[in-house]
Structures are given as C-alpha cells and as structure tokens.
Amino acid sequence: MAVLYTTLDSKFPSINRKITTRWIKQILIDYNKRAGDITCIFCSNDEILRINNFYLNHDCYTDIITFDYSKGDIISGDLFIALDMIKYNSMKYNVNYFEELYRVIIHGILHLCGFNDKLIKDIKVMREGENRALEKIRS
C-alpha cells in the first residue's frame, strides 16, 4: 500500500515525499492504524470549491476535503488540498507555509483515523493530534 502525491491544477509543492510518507505512516502507527492507499491531491481554490459543491453541497472554500475509504485499521482515502487556501491561511495566522501545509495534511489523516471536528471538544482533540504530529515532522 502507498501514499501517493499528485496535482490537479496547481504546481506541486516542494515537499520531500519520502519524509512526508514516512511521517504519515508513523502517525498512523501511533494510532494503531496501517496505511492503505492514501492520495494527497494538491489543487486550487477553484477546484476545491467545485469538489465541495458537487460532492458535499457546500458553496464555500476550504483548505481540505477528505474522502475516507478506510476499512478497519487499514487507512485509505483521498485528501484534496487547496494550496491557495494554505497560502492564505499561513499569512492570516502568521505561520510558515509548509507548517500550514503539513498541518492540513495531518488534519486529513486524522479524519481518516476517525477524528472529527464539528464540536468544540472534538476540535480540541483534533488540534492536539495535529500539534503532536507536527512535533514529529519538525524533529
């Protein structure tokens, strides 16, 4: 099983795929999960809006849309990541672009692991998971 990276209508971000894949797999192990087929699909705001409208009936931009195909402890899914929104949010929150990109990637991975972020208590747990994961990619 593999973690794959592709783009739809955006330039590929300059991340080290090997390190990123190793990091994702380590986070999955931390949650007693295994990697199935996971695809990170980098796209524009226009594309994420189209996907959001078509599949979720939401008429708004977002930084990530996660489609979960997991079965049991084997984690599989597609992560559509809007690079325009990553750039916007990194400036808005005054954080490094790549830190924001990795936060969004792991946010999608945590969704695939069963994390939610609709309720305030769930958002707190999600943020804690993101922060723990980001510590690992920094080291």
From Swiss-Prot:
Zn(2+) binds at residues 107, 111, 117. Its EC number is 3.1.-.-. Its cofactor is Zn(2+). HAMAP family: Endoribonucl_YbeY (MF_00009). SUPFAM superfamilies: Metalloproteases ('zincins'), catalytic domain. GO terms for molecular function: metalloendopeptidase activity; RNA endonuclease activity; zinc ion binding. The keyword Transmembrane does not apply. Binds 1 zinc ion. Keywords: Cytoplasm, Endonuclease, Hydrolase, Metal-binding, Nuclease, Ribosome biogenesis, rRNA processing, Zinc. It is found in: Cytoplasm. Pfam families: YbeY. NCBIfam families: rRNA maturation RNase YbeY. This is Endoribonuclease YbeY.
